[in-house]
Structures are given as C-alpha cells and as structure tokens.
Amino acid sequence: MSASSPLSPTAGGPFAAWYAAFGDWARTDGAAWLYLFKALLAAFIALGVSMRLDLPAPKTAMTTVFIVMQRKAAPCSRKASTGSPARSSGSSRRSRSSGCSRSSRSCSCWRSPCGSRCAPPAPRATATSAVTASCSPAIRPR
C-alpha cells in the first residue's frame, strides 16, 4: 500500500498542470485580455446608455470610453494628483499640473515637453551661451 494519500499535493492530479499553465498565462497574456474585455464591456455599456437616453451621437460615448481607458494615461493622472510639496523641489502647483515628479526626473506623460522625460530646468544665460529650450537645438548668438 502506498504511503501517500490520494489528496496529497505531491500526487498532482490531472488539473495540476492545467492550473500551473493557467497561472502562467494569467501573469503574461491574461492581463492584456482582461484589459481588452473591460474596455469592450465599458464601451458597450456606454453605447447602451447613450442609446437609452436617445443621444444624437452614440459613437461619441464609445470613443470617449476608449480615450479615457488608455493604459498610459492612468499612471500620469495618478502621479499628477498625488504630487506633494515635500517630494518635489519646485512648487506644488507646478508638480501637480505637469504630472512630473521633479525628484525622480521620470515622466512618460504626454504633458512633459519632450515626451519621455521631464524637462530639466533651463540653463542660466551667460556671456558665452544663449538660453535654449530643453527640447530644441542650441541657438548660437551671432
């Protein structure tokens, strides 16, 4: 007679491999499929509500859902709403409106001037150099 019981975790069973494969899928592709399902569900709910309210352009509601549910917009809006003066070296109003954390210098928000990083402060004008914008090429004085 076997020393292990049929209910022991070492026995595995027919569903152990399926459970492990599902867990692996859920960590990789499952998040994307879940996001797609939520976006489509929200779009169809918005379409149904707009048709029920007899709005003139129901497609506008669906378009709005897809614009609002962009994945990259969420971290920027969260970062912009939680800016605190203690963390940033600039004023709290500027850090909240720009969505950038001045201390970390990382911002992938559409609000940042260069797109991928927060713009560094403009250099001070000296006799040998002109003040340049952070994303434009240097302007040489004549």
From Swiss-Prot:
What cellular-component terms does GO give this entry? plasma membrane
Instruction: Tell me where on the tree of life, at the top rank, the source sits.
Output: Bacteria
**Which Cys pairs are S-S linked?**
none
This chain belongs to the protein called: Fusaric acid resistance protein FusB
Q: Outline the segment boundaries, as ranges, of region: Disordered.
A: 73-142
User: Where along the chain is composition biased (Low complexity)?
Assistant: 81-142
Q: What does this protein do?
A: Involved in the resistance (detoxification) of the fungal toxin fusaric acid.
- An MF annotation (GO) of this entry: transmembrane transporter activity
Task: Show the InterPro entries listed in the entry.
Answer: PHBA_efflux_AaeB/fusaric-R
